């Protein structure tokens, strides 16, 4: 028996492994099974070139549970005593301290970086044995034993067959890895597509009402997964079946892209376009990254462009440096090339479907839209390609490319300054009356109700020359696309004040909502009262909900305009009745206000060119008294209008109709509206 110390050029390796990899204990199984696969494939290679002339036989790798042990057995090339010394005892770990300091926050980077895959066994084992026999003729079987200290023993043993058995004596605090269900879960996660058969236990079958173990090996992996095969060999059903295998609970994918490139890097895989139903963030990280069919991670940021992390599927590449920090990944030239390649393949595939089967593309647009919009918002080179097949959808559910839509609306929706106005709605039902008003004028209205459409509107305004997007409820229809300068026909000062004050006094109090009441001549066929909201302020508040750094707008109240149509007979009727009812009280107040106003103006004119200190104190005092008097009279007059309005059911009814039309009438206010409507009927 030989004894010795493991050669580590700095500090003991085992505390390092325990300290930095405690959160990733489970990857020991991935590493050990991967090593067994490598040993098996190397034997296959030697046989193919004539260096191994023996019988290959069954090359299945076995994972077996004992009372306190896990054993991974292969019939690969095995190890000689010299190879044990070279690859196990003398660990090339120069610069370990520097490495650990650099990657102390990226624990998974350590495993595999310096050939430490085998030593991951010590994360879960208090003792490890290797019983191995080389494929070479006359090789002596060797048993290597280590208890987690730098000391080891090597002794000759009897072993009939070539290959290696790695026996782990599991630590007391890692007993979960002796549970069949837990090991099965890890093998399924990491080893489902390894290229050599992996057996874990025996298959079971139902017999006499219970499960009975058979003599047949339970093979847990598919050695030739779909992405390793030629696309020409595969049917649509093959792709769909593989998708169901990867994502059992998901709907059928929209379509897929088979990746296969050998130069200047190696990359295979299949990417699926799923149906994204809800929150974007919840749908990320569904792409599985493999290295030579060994599962590595589903966090593919930095390898796949951000917008494509919404896709599902598999990417397999030996050229992605898996065991380094994410910051290094992002600067690696191969990773950048792979990212660019994937983006190009996706855009080419979308362009191909659009060109060859536009009907299918339009049918799937609602599901594709989030991928394409996300890509255009976040990646300029994708935008350049996608602008040729990205679609607008109007409220009649017709689809147009950007160029087609521009041609459609340019004659009728260009304003007096030459700006092309894109009208849109984000809720077809709630904004129906505004959409109808626009379409009655011959305008086309887009439906932009997607998760990313707020951001898309802002981006497209910057991309499109002399263009502006305006929501149909942001103003009255005649102001959405102003085609010529025109005089704003509205009520005279006193009449406007009377009716706007009356309506304003009856507006309900709403949390963080403010109204500005105005009058406008909209024609006798338009609604008597409308609610609009400034495009700019609404858009800023919407952006504040999805973009950091704009919380100021999010805290501001919602500002709405209550527009009274002075041409409508009901508004005229309210105004006439208000004037008749209020005139006796208001007239003397207005006369007094006119007198106060005249004197205020005289004083202000006389003080116009004087310095503050040159104005007599008496004049200052008089002006202050006049201001107070003015406010007092104004409040008194407004009180009269408000008093009249409080007893006028038509005013309250018109306000509630406008609120109801905008989905702003709820609770007690809605109940009162219903009661009042019944009374009026």
Swiss-Prot record:
Residues covered by region (B): 327-545
InterPro entries with a match to the protein in the record: HATPase_C_sf (IPR036890), Heat_shock_protein_90_CS (IPR019805), HSP90_C (IPR037196), Hsp90_fam (IPR001404), Hsp90_N (IPR020575), Ribosomal_Su5_D2-typ_SF (IPR020568)
Keyword flag Nucleus: no
UniProt region (C), positions on chain: 546-681
Positions with biased composition (Basic and acidic residues): 599-620
Region feature (A): 1-326
GO molecular function: ATP binding; ATP hydrolysis activity; ATP-dependent protein folding chaperone; unfolded protein binding
Keyword check for ATP-binding: yes
Protein name, entry field: Chaperone protein HtpG
Species for this entry: Bacteroides thetaiotaomicron (strain ATCC 29148 / DSM 2079 / JCM 5827 / CCUG 10774 / NCTC 10582 / VPI-5482 / E50)
């Amino acid at each position: 028996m030989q004894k010795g110390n493991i050669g580590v050029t700095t500090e003991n390796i085992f505390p390092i492994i325990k300290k930095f990899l405690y959160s990733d204990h489970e990857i020991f199984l991935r590493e050990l099974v991967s090593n067994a696969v490598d040993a098996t494939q190397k034997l296959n290679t030697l046989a193919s070139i004539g260096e191994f002339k023996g019988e290959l036989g069954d090359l299945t790798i076995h994972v077996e549970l004992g009372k306190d042990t896990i054993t991974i057995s292969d019939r690969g090339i095995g190890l000689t005593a010299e190879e044990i010394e070279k690859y196990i005892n003398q660990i090339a770990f120069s610069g370990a301290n520097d490495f650990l300091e650099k990657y102390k926050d990226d624990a998974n980077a350590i495993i595999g970086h310096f050939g430490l895959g085998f030593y991951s066994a010590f994360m879960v084992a208090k003792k490890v044995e290797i019983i191995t026999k080389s494929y070479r003729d006359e090789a002596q079987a060797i048993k290597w034993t280590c208890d987690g200290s730098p000391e080891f023993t090597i002794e000759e043993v009897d072993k009939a067959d070539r290959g290696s058995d790695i026996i782990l004596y599991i630590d007391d605090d890692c007993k979960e890895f002796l549970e069949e269900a837990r090991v099965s879960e890890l093998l399924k996660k990491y080893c489902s597509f390894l290229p050599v058969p992996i057996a874990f236990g025996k298959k079971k079958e139902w017999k006499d009402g219970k499960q009975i173990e058979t003599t047949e090996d339970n093979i847990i992996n598919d050695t030739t997964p779909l992405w390793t095969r030629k696309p020409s060999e595969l049917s649509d059903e093959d792709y769909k079946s593989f998708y169901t295998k990867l994502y059992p609970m998901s709907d059928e994918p929209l379509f897929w892209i088979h990746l296969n490139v050998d130069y200047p890097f190696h990359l295979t895989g299949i990417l699926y376009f799923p149906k994204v139903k809800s929150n974007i963030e919840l749908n990320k990280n569904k792409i599985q990254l493999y290295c030579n069919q060994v599962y590595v991670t589903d966090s593919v940021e930095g390898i796949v462009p951000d917008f494509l992390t919404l896709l599902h599927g598999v990417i397999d590449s030996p050229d992605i440096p898996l065991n380094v920090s994410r910051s290094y990944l992002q600067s690696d030239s191969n990773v950048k090339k792979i990212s660019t390649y994937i983006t190009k393949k996706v855009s080419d595939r979308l362009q191909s479907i659009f060109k060859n089967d536009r009907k299918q593309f339009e049918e799937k647009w609602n599901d594709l839209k989030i991928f394409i919009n996300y890509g255009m918002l976040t990646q300029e080179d994708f935008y350049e390609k996608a602008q040729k097949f990205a679609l607008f959808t109007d409220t009649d559910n017709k689809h147009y490319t950007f160029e087609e839509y521009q041609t459609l609306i340019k004659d009728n929706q260009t304003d007096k300054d030459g700006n092309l106005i894109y009208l849109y709605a984000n809720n077809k039902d709630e904004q129906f009356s505004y959409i109808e008003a626009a379409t009655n004028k011959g305008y086309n209205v887009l439906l932009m109700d997607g998760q990313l459409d707020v951001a898309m509107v802002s981006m497209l305004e910057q991309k499109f020359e002399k263009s502006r997007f305006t929501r149909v409820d942001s103003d009255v229809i005649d102001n959405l696309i102003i085609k010529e300068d025109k005089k704003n026909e509205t009520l005279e000062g006193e009449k406007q004040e009377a009716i706007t004050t009356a309506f304003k006094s009856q507006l309900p109090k709403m949390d963080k909502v403010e109204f500005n009441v105005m009058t406008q001549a909209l024609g006798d066929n338009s609604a008597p009262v409308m609610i609009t909201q400034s495009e700019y302020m609404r858009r800023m508040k919407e952006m504040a909900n999805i973009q950091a750094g704009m919380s100021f707008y999010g805290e501001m109240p919602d500002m709405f305009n209550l527009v009274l149509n002075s041409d409508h007979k009901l508004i005229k009727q309210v105004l006439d009745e208000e004037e008749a009812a209020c005139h006796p009280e208001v007239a003397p107040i207005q006369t007094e206000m006119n007198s106060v106003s005249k004197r205020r103006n005289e004083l202000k004119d006389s003080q116009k060119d004087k310095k503050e200190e040159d104005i007599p104190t008496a004049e200052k005092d008089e002006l202050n008294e006049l201001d107070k008097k003015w406010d007092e009279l104004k409040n008194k007059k407004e009180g009269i209008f408000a008093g009249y309005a409080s007893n006028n059911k038509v005013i309250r009814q018109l306000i509630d109709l406008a609120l109801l039309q905008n989905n702003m009438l709820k609770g007690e206010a809605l109940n009162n509206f219903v009661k009042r409507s019944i009374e009026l009927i």
